[in-house]
Amino acid sequence: VGFFEAENVKTVVDFAQKESHQNIILYGNSMGASAIMRAVAKEIVNPSSIIIECPFGTMQQTVENRFKNMNVPIFPMANLLTFWGGTINNFWAFNHNPEDYAKSIKQPILMMYGKKDLNVTNQETQQIFKNLISENKVLKTFPEAGHENYLNRFGEEWKENISLFLNDLK
């Protein structure tokens, strides 16, 4: 879910720095995006820029979205799963909120989102983007994409978005 995985992000950055790489750009999709956002917000990494795809807004909301997708009653089940999932994994899941982590992200950031994503709502995406404090933030939307790998399905458009973002960093 991206909570403890923030430490994995630190491990990767530490390795890259040890190998003398200085211009570190982090890329993450879904849970990976949330892990990057947490790692940056908790100041355990400081990349030069960030590229993220379809991060969820809050742990509670992402659980609710999945219950809705399965036509399972959201209340009280989503609350119980958020509570119990966090408890058995030794963290308070109600505080795992990438939309809050966004308030600490000052690096240039490209955020991509699929308009047909059933797991992450447009409202969550807009809130995250609004909360980003970066002066160089870009939101690209794929109108026909769901919660998926955009490169696989929209390769040329994805590559163009990445290239434009990276070229603007120079």
Each language-model region and where it sits:
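Alpha/beta-hydrolase fold nucleophile elbow
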Residues: 19-30
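Acidic catalytic loop of the alpha/beta-hydrolase fold
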Residues: 116-120, 148-149
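Alpha/beta-hydrolase active-site loop
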Residues: 1-19
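Short beta-strand/loop motif that positions the catalytic acidic residue
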Residues: 105-106, 111-113, 117
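Catalytic histidine-centered segment of alpha/beta-hydrolase-like enzymes
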Residues: 145-156
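Short alpha-helix in the alpha/beta-hydrolase fold that links the catalytic acid
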Residues: 107, 121-130
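Glycine-rich nucleophile elbow surrounding the catalytic serine of serine-hydrolase chemistry
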Residues: 28-38
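Hydrolase active-site cap/lid region
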Residues: 38-92
